[in-house]
């Protein structure tokens, strides 16, 4: 018997990447899944894959920054599946990241739109899920944060700020509704090779980022989905209010770890020690 038999999950941003991996993981363990994504065709494709594996899912196209649309999403989930037990807030305004620059170069419209989706959208989904979870005796929420929300960068100002705020939103929710048997945790992925990221990062940048990991491979969406499934399940029944990094050790080391002069720095598979003396990308 799967860990999510009899449970209903809403997963936003579930049409591709980490969100899709989460939806599949929940369905494979018996959960019924509402696959929500702004790209309706991607949501339908994910639902079709779940159905092909004998799972149960419903596809819905939604912009989570729209309060009325979010309310309709949860009403539909309740009408179709009888309630909501689990929520994965994964949707994020990733299409804005190329314009998400340093503070003085940042367009305010990018800041506003990023916050509207990443933070307001997460809040709206939580506000719809919490009463329904209370009605069913409790539930579990995972908010998809990022390592970007834990350390500064030369760009991605809006994205990082939204994810840092999401971490505190998760702690606040856990504090305010723990008495109602609702758990909430945030997951902070590092370098996870989704199709979108593979298309955006050239080989030089991938090599640079991998030097800052302690494990000799990049992360996969399935790695994150396994952590999310654990946090949603009864296996994590006493875990709440936490921000859990899944980054291959990217934030665990001293800043000089990946410097060329550090002979102990991790190297991509097949790379020799002589590469330490080569110019960096």
UniProtKB/Swiss-Prot annotation:
InterPro entries: NAD(P)-bd_dom_sf, Sc_DH/Rdtase_CS, SDR_fam. The keyword Oxidoreductase applies. Transmembrane segments: none annotated. Its EC number is 1.-.-.-. The keyword Cell division does not apply. It is an enzyme of class 1 (oxidoreductase). Keywords: Oxidoreductase. It holds the Pfam family adh_short_C2. One of its GO terms (molecular function) is oxidoreductase activity. NAD(+) binds at residues 10-34. Substrate binds at residue 146. Belongs to the short-chain dehydrogenases/reductases (SDR) family. This is Probable short-chain type dehydrogenase/reductase blr2146. It comes from Bradyrhizobium diazoefficiens (strain JCM 10833 / BCRC 13528 / IAM 13628 / NBRC 14792 / USDA 110). The lineage of its organism: Bacteria, Pseudomonadati, Pseudomonadota, Alphaproteobacteria, Hyphomicrobiales.
């Amino acid at each position: 018997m799967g860990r999510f038999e009899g449970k209903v999950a809403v997963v936003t941003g579930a049409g591709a990447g980490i969100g899709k991996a989460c939806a599949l993981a929940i369905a494979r363990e018996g959960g019924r899944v509402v696959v929500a994504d702004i790209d309706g065709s991607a949501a339908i494709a994910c639902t079709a894959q779940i159905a092909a594996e004998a799972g149960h899912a419903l596809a819905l196209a939604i912009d989570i920054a729209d309060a009325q649309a979010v309310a309709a999403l949860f009403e539909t989930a309740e009408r179709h599946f009888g309630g909501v037990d689990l929520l994965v807030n994964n949707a994020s305004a990733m299409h804005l990241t190329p314009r998400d620059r340093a503070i003085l170069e940042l367009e305010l419209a990018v800041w506003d739109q990023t916050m509207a989706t990443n933070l307001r959208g997460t809040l709206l989904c939580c506000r719809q899920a919490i009463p329904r979870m209370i009605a069913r005796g409790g539930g579990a929420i995972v908010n998809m944060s990022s390592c970007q929300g834990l350390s500064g960068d030369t760009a991605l100002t809006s994205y990082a700020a939204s994810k840092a705020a999401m971490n505190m939103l998760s702690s606040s929710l856990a504090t305010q509704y723990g008495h109602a048997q609702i758990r909430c945790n945030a997951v902070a992925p590092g370098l996870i090779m989704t199709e979108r990221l593979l298309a955006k990062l050239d080989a030089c940048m991938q090599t640079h980022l991998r030097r800052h990991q302690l494990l000799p491979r990049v992360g996969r969406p399935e790695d994150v989905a396994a952590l999310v499934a654990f946090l949603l399940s009864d296996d994590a029944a006493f875990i709440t209010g936490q921000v859990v990094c899944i980054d291959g050790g990217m934030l665990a080391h001293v800043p000089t770890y990946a410097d060329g002069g550090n002979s102990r720095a991790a190297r991509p598979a097949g790379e020799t020690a002589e590469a330490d003396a080569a110019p960096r990308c």
